[in-house]
Regions:
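Conserved C-terminal C-lobe helix
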Residues: 340-349
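Short hinge/gating elements
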Residues: 326-335
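Conserved ATP-binding/catalytic core of the eukaryotic-like protein kinase fold
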Residues: 11, 64-326, 341
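Structured, non-catalytic alpha/beta "coupling" segments that mediate domain-domain communication
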Residues: 32-58
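N-terminal alpha-helical segment
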Residues: 2-3, 18-19, 103-106, 345
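Eukaryotic low-complexity, mixed-charge intrinsically disordered interaction/regulatory segments enriched
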Residues: 1-26
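Short, hydrophobic secondary-structure boundary micro-motifs
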Residues: 19-21, 35-36, 49-53, 288-290, ...
Length: 349
């Protein structure tokens, strides 16, 4: 296998331990090849990758300045402890609130140099989207403010969890248990829709699962590209710019990929939920991620709009030896898993 094909195969294995075992087996004693593949993977992680971040999450040319906050920095009553996330326009920190109560929180702040009118509007829209919702499976907004230099921030509930797909695989959860978690996620998204908010970027890394008294609890996070339907999220109505792709391609609905300027509605989130369910059941997304990674921008759009996804029950037969691992993560074997997925789940996912 070429280094490129090894790299693409490794990207499809989210669990670090399983990815390392795959690389050990495929690279063998070729230490130089392993080092080059590891560097490719590290560069991909550092860049985020088009499939791993929202397509609209780009940095305006010439506006970026280095992040000035470091562990120990005080922003209002919040002491920053460590960076836990970063997007195109914002950075998320784990922080400790010191007054009037002491607790751990997540603090999201606009990057230096990114405080343009459009970015601030998007940032404020995310804060307002979270503020209007009150659901146990959606991260809560606790506070908001601005730094001395005027950069806005908001404070959220700290969700110490892992992406829903990783949680299910690590715990070898059978399909029935995965469906229970998925239904809970659907209830959370339904609540957002009832409040007039479309998420627009539903994917595993935006659905984190944590344990409460030994019970897995999913939390929907990151409404950074959310859109209002029946209420205004900011004082100025936000429109998606014509020709701007909003969402993450592997989970994106055809109407999002179209970029025609036409409004999308709650059905777009429902489509993305279907992709998430497909991945929970089969371990893969409906459109082969390798095809998306090697495709150009126009081809990505065409694949999302036109590609015919195989039914979940037949997808396993195309995965070769990987099907045994995926089925094992679901507490069964490939034949039984295919039988389980045939029927209603084939049509729902």
């Amino acid at each position: 296998m070429t280094e490129r094909s090894i790299f693409l195969e490794a990207l499809d294995i989210p669990d670090p331990a399983r990815r390392a075992r795959y690389l050990d087996a495929i690279c063998g004693d070729d230490a130089a090849q392993r080092e080059r593949v590891d560097k490719l993977l590290a560069a991909h992680e550092a860049a985020g990758g088009i499939l791993d971040r929202p397509a609209a999450d780009e940095v305006p040319t010439g506006m970026y300045r280095p992040i000035t906050e470091t562990p120990g920095t005080l922003i209002g009553p919040y002491k920053l402890l460590q960076q836990i996330g970063e997007g195109g326009f914002g950075v998320v920190y784990m922080a400790e609130q010191q007054a009037p109560v002491r607790r751990m929180v997540a603090l999201k702040i606009i990057k230096p140099g990114m405080d343009t009118r459009q970015v601030i509007a998007r940032f404020e829209a995310e804060r307002q989207a979270l503020a209007v919702m009150d659901h146990p499976n959606i991260a809560k907004v606790l506070d908001a403010g601005a730094t001395e230099s005027g950069r806005p921030y908001f404070v959220m509930e700290l969700v110490k969890g892992v992406p829903i797909t990783e949680f299910c695989d690590q715990n070898h959860m059978p399909a029935a248990e995965r469906l229970k978690l998925f239904v809970t996620v659907c209830h959370a998204i339904q609540h957002a829709h009832q409040k007039g908010v479309i998420h627009r970027d539903i994917k595993p890394t935006n659905v984190l699962v944590t344990l409460h008294d030994g019970v897995p609890v999913p939390k929907v996070i990151d409404f950074g590209v959310a859109k209002a339907t029946v209420l205004r999220l900011t004082e100025k109505t936000l429109f998606t710019a014509y020709g701007q792709m909003v969402g993450t391609p592997a989970y994106m609905s055809p109407e999002q990929a179209e970029m025609s300027g036409l409004d999308i509605d709650t059905r777009s989130d429902i489509y993305s939920l279907g992709v998430l369910l497909y991945e929970l059941l089969t371990g893969t997304t409906p459109i082969d991620s390798k095809r998306l990674r090697t495709a150009g921008y126009a081809e990505i759009q065409r694949l999302i709009r036109e590609a015919e996804a195989p039914r979940p029950s037949t997808r396993l037969s195309s995965l070769g030896g990987e099907a045994t691992v995926l089925a094992g993560n679901r507490g069964t074997d490939p034949r039984r898993l295919a039988q389980l997925l045939a029927g209603d789940l084939d049509w729902i996912a």
